[in-house]
Amino acid sequence: MANDAMALMKYLKIKKAHLVGASMGGLIAQTIALNSPEIVSSLTLMVTSPGIRDERLSKPDPIFLDGMTESALMMIKNNQKEAMLKTFKASIGTRFSYDDLVIEELFNIVDDHGTNTYAFHSKAIEKTPSYLDKLKDIKIPTLVINGSEDPLIPIDHAFALSEGITESKLYVMEGVGHELPEELINEISS
């Protein structure tokens, strides 16, 4: 996916860009920053990790993992909608509440991409190496943003990113989980 993003930049004749990546997008942005730093002017890494499977970093919250397991079983029973809604509700944090209509809209957006979305997403993350020991090589101004209640990417991942990238700043959003609701747009963009 990093190669796809770089190919798109080349096609659009974008020589240098500010990269913003959330979750897996943050892993993609790190990959680009490490492999082609000359095309990156700055980074914003949101709710992401330098190595989701790195043993030196905290694992996802067991309650969230239980929800993912239950969701996987629901998907096997061909109930992807209920599975996604359950996972989403487990990952939002306590600062904001979501009504079922908003969650339903999000499901419809994801569902438009096909039934194997979660499987492909998980496979891609599984194949991404840990960048924890390479963060020092990122010499690009970076903003790291994470929720204090992210059950998938615990807060120590954000601290690791911020401490590993010398030109970085960390912004922690209190009470926010892995999902970034619309109400945070102004806070994040400022």
Model-identified regions with their sequence ranges:
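Acidic catalytic loop of the alpha/beta-hydrolase fold
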Residues: 149-153, 178
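Alpha/beta-hydrolase
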Residues: 63-133, 140
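Conserved acidic catalytic loop of the alpha/beta-hydrolase fold
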Residues: 1-17
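Conserved alpha/beta-hydrolase "nucleophile elbow" surrounding the catalytic nucleophile
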Residues: 17, 21-23, 147
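Short glycine-enriched nucleophile-adjacent loop
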Residues: 26-37, 43
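Flexible "cap/lid" loop of the alpha/beta hydrolase fold
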Residues: 41-75
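Short beta-strand/loop motif that positions the catalytic acidic residue
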Residues: 138, 144-146, 150
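Catalytic active-site module of serine/aspartate enzymes centered on a nucleophile-bearing elbow/loop
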Residues: 167-190
